[in-house]
UniProtKB/Swiss-Prot annotation:
Family in the record: Belongs to the universal ribosomal protein uL6 family.
Taxonomic placement: Bacteria, Bacillati, Bacillota, Bacilli, Lactobacillales
Pfam family, one: Ribosomal_L6
GO molecular function terms attached to this record: rRNA binding; structural constituent of ribosome
The protein's name: Large ribosomal subunit protein uL6
Natural source organism: Latilactobacillus sakei subsp. sakei (strain 23K)
Length: 177
């Protein structure tokens, strides 16, 4: 059983965590600022540069761990940031950037255009690699998943858009008689 909610979060130097009256927590750091609404059933306590969360009952255990993980991800985002890398594998598959619009040519009869959300940076170092970075783990991961969903990797030839560290399990083709 996980006990993530009980772990104490250490706030690094240069990062400020503030809570307003409506349970909105704002984290400011060298890379930017993130604000998120937190559930009032879990209480946040600050002691110097340490933050911990307490719950009133065991039925709130899942929310307890979720809130602790969300705040920790916000702190990591404003200090280090998050990055996802995708590879395009297939003949003629390529990506290019036009302003903030990512244009994908992945075997359809038309190019697929995707607008990057606010706070997410997209880089295309080569026409088969895409790097998505930002301070919000949720936005970076969501946009990377949306790009991957345009043409997910298929198991027979391995063609498609995949994360760089993703392993695609290959299948054997049909054997003829």
């Amino acid at each position: 059983m996980s006990r993530i909610g009980l772990k104490v979060i250490e706030v690094p130097a240069g990062v400020t965590v503030t809570k307003d009256g409506e349970n909105n927590i704002t984290v400011k750091g060298p890379k930017g600022e993130l604000t998120r609404h937190f559930n009032p059933i879990i209480e946040m306590h600050e002691e110097g540069n340490l933050i911990n969360f307490t719950r009133s009952s065991d039925s709130d255990r899942a929310m307890h761990g979720t809130m602790r993980a969300n705040l920790n991800n916000m702190i990591l985002g404003v200090t280090e940031g998050f990055k996802k890398t995708l590879d395009l594998i297939g003949v003629g598959y390529r990506a290019q950037l036009k302003g903030k619009t990512l244009v994908l040519n992945v075997g359809y009869s038309h190019p697929v255009e995707m607008e990057a959300p606010e706070g997410v940076n997209v880089e295309v170092p080569s026409n088969t690699n895409i790097i998505i970075s930002g301070i919000s783990k949720q936005k970076v991961g969501q946009f990377a998943a949306e790009i991957r969903d345009v043409r997910p990797p298929e198991p027979y030839k391995g063609k498609g858009i995949r994360y760089t560290d993703e392993h695609v399990r290959r299948k054997e083709g049909k054997t003829g008689k």
